């Protein structure tokens, strides 16, 4: 399984919360691939504490990182537009992450499922944080 880690999970791993580091280690041992997006990396750096820099770099180096392509951008924009027409406001960041997960056929690992209403998405069932 290819897991796409959302920012909430990345932060939990780096701040040693909720046993997320151990969970990811177990998933890797079981043969799963861990990835994130360049957008999640930007969000992580935006809130990073100075003392977390080395640990953050080391952790991110161990992950695959998916970029935003023109095709992904079109899908993300279409998703945002589709839900806006239904009266649901989604952030562009979340629609980009969703589009990458859909295009790359990744299972999304997030604490914020409510931000990702797309039925095309598969989610990893995280234990309660």
Q: PLM features: residue spans?
A:
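Nucleotide phosphate-binding site architecture
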Residues: 10-11, 42-45, 117, 124
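Alpha-helix capping/helix-boundary segments
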Residues: 9-10, 40, 72, 96-97, ...
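Short, well-structured N-terminal submotif of metal-dependent ribonuclease cores
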Residues: 1-36, 45-61, 129
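Donor nucleotide-sugar recognition loop
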Residues: 88-90
